[in-house]
Amino acid sequence: MEHPGRIVVVSADIGAGHDRAADELAHRLRARGFAVDRLNLLHLLPHPVHRVVRETYRGVLHRLPWGYHALFRLTGSSQTAVRAIRALLRPFRRHLRRRIPPDTRAVVTTYPFANQLLGPLRRRGRLRVPVITYVTDFVVHPTWLAPGVDVYCAVRHAETHQASAADVTAVQPLVSRAFTRTGPEDLRRARQRFGLPAEGVLALVVAGSWGAGEVAATVAEVAAAGVRPVVVCGHNAALRHRLRGAGRHVLGWVDDMPALMRAVDVMVENAGGLTCQEALAAGLPVVTYRPIAGHGRANAAILARAGLSRWAATPQQLGPVLAAVIGTGPVAPSRDDVSQDPAGLVAEAARRAPPAGPAGTRRPLLDPVGDAVAVLAALLQSTGGLR
């Protein structure tokens, strides 16, 4: 049977949240009959550059969090900084356009910098199909915004950054239906599966796929509060090695997070991204503690304001907050039955759109000049050379 159209989903392997959202969207769209292509934005870069970009970002997050926070604030308050990023990415627009098949009916992004490439292509008429983005954070930061993007989607409690004026469509979270809260028997089986104690209160400590932030301090302080921590270190082997011992339950990368969330009583997190959306969908109480710089702190504030999590701002607050959350027991799963399924929104847009058609085979003669000028202007703007 002929499929109703092709949809391209663009993500990036910066952490795991962007890819997990893209995976779930692709799953839902395929269930609706669409052909789905997945693109990793960083694969547009030459392989050594791809690795350098990813590892530099990881290094800054781990070793220079103040630098990451400063960049997050700069791009949040300065349109010039966002335009500079867009200009620096301009040389890769054509390469991305050529990766979009002619029968594509819509392009969806789950990574902000993809919008800085696709938005201009759409605005200039080089991409005829709608560009839709799903914001994986609770804060819609200006780096997600680009002229030409048709629809911005975010979960219901998300907030636009103070410098943003975007019109955002509230949608259901892109988390697997497997994130559900079940009964005591499922808890027992889940604990047995992961080798966890059958009795006692367990706190799941998560820090993203890179194990970023003050994880060791968090683990020690959760234990000092009388709650046994279960730590997920993701791909951070060094962190896992450092935390092992003393009867701790320390895991690396976990494929079946729905099962692990059924095994614990509370989650302590520091980033507020997709894992937070998954915990809320599963009805697992969430405590934010020692949030990482940039988006972590911004998400923490929004989650606390919305009443979706409790933010323990100091070590002295952690124990009472954990006791209060655990004392109330499991919470009702945060299922949004009012907002639209993002897959339905994308499917509707794709059915109305004409096919993308072929990418231009000839590069306009002035494009290389424009690329060079844009990059030079971006560099001058970022250093204050243009006023």
Q: In which residue ranges do the predicted regions lie?
A:
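Soluble, non-transmembrane catalytic domains of enzymes that act on hydrophobic metabolites at membranes
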Residues: P4-L45, T104-R105, T110, G119, ...
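Active-site and donor-binding regions of nucleotide-sugar-utilizing enzymes
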Residues: A21, S77-H161
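Conserved N-terminal ligand/cofactor-binding loop architecture of enzyme catalytic domains
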Residues: E24-R99
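A nucleotide-sugar donor-handling region in carbohydrate enzymes
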Residues: V151-V201, A207, G234-N236
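Donor-nucleotide binding loops and adjacent catalytic segments primarily
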Residues: E185-V264
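A donor-sugar binding/catalytic signature common to diverse glycosyltransferases
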Residues: M257-A298
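C-terminal "capping" alpha-helix adjacent to the active site of nucleotide-linked donor transferases
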Residues: A304-G307, A313-P330, R352
